[in-house]
């Protein structure tokens, strides 16, 4: 339920160019959710980049349920970034990932290796390139390997941690997190239509009233059977309120002099 609430608020209340929610709101609805430290744009990684004090790092780590490290190619763009003076080589990126691993050990937080997947297969990067170019990104042609890596690829990528630690972050911990997550549907199985009192009754009365105006006091059997069949389908599926809303809108528009087609 909290996840649905956050998704709704991110789109309806806090939307600004993209869905988002303040951290304070996140905290209000945290129950039942697992929060990871995210990619290089996450606050933990950014704090490490600017060599934040240990106290601040500890506070940030404490907030998360698990910490994330990602393939070097995901963050290789920082090596050539003139605004960044912390990362100058592949070795610097390795050291950042190792720091996160050490923090996980120090604060007893599971560390998981994630791909930051933006597309399924390597060849699909062309679609992200097109989208980024259309949004004005000057570096759209420099695509990071943000596809879904295989287990073997991830183990090879994180071999610098040692085989035992690589298996822990790639396989063991990721499965632990996955096992903690229940299966949910992104769309709730219930319909949640708006509520207007007595919609079912009112729709039935309006339909039969109109039918009697057209066919007289006694309805032909074929008309009555068809009317009951249609109404039963609408009402039993919870859609009566939709028809009532449409009727009210059309009636109000006509009343105000606007033709509705």
Where are these regions (language model features)?
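Phosphodiester-processing cores and adjacent nucleic acid-binding clamps
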Residues: 1-261
């Amino acid at each position: 339920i909290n996840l649905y609430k956050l998704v709704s608020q991110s789109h309806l209340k806090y939307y600004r160019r993209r869905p988002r929610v303040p951290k304070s709101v996140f905290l209000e609805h945290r129950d039942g959710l697992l929060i990871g430290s995210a990619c290089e744009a996450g606050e933990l990684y950014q704090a490490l980049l600017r060599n934040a004090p240990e106290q601040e790092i500890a506070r940030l780590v404490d907030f998360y349920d698990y910490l994330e490290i990602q393939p070097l190619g995901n963050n290789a763009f920082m090596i050539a970034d003139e605004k960044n003076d912390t990362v100058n080589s592949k070795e610097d990126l390795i050291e950042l990932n190792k720091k996160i691993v050490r923090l996980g050990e120090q604060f007893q937080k599971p560390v998981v290796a994630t791909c930051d997947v933006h597309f399924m297969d390597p060849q699909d990067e062309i679609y992200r390139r097109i989208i980024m170019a259309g949004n004005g990104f000057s570096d759209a042609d420099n695509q990071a390997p943000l596809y879904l890596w295989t287990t073997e690829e991830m183990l090879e990528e994180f071999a610098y941690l040692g085989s035992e630690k690589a298996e822990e972050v790639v396989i063991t911990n990721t499965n632990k997190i996955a096992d903690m997550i229940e299966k949910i549907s992104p769309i709730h199985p219930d319909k949640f239509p708006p509520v207007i009192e007595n919609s079912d009754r009112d729709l039935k009365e309006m339909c039969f009233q109109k039918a009697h105006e057209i066919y007289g006091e006694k309805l032909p059997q074929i008309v009555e059977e068809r009317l009951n069949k249609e109404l039963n389908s609408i009402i039993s599926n919870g859609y009566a309120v939709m028809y009532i809303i449409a009727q009210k809108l059309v009636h109000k528009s006509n009343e105000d002099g606007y033709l509705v087609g």
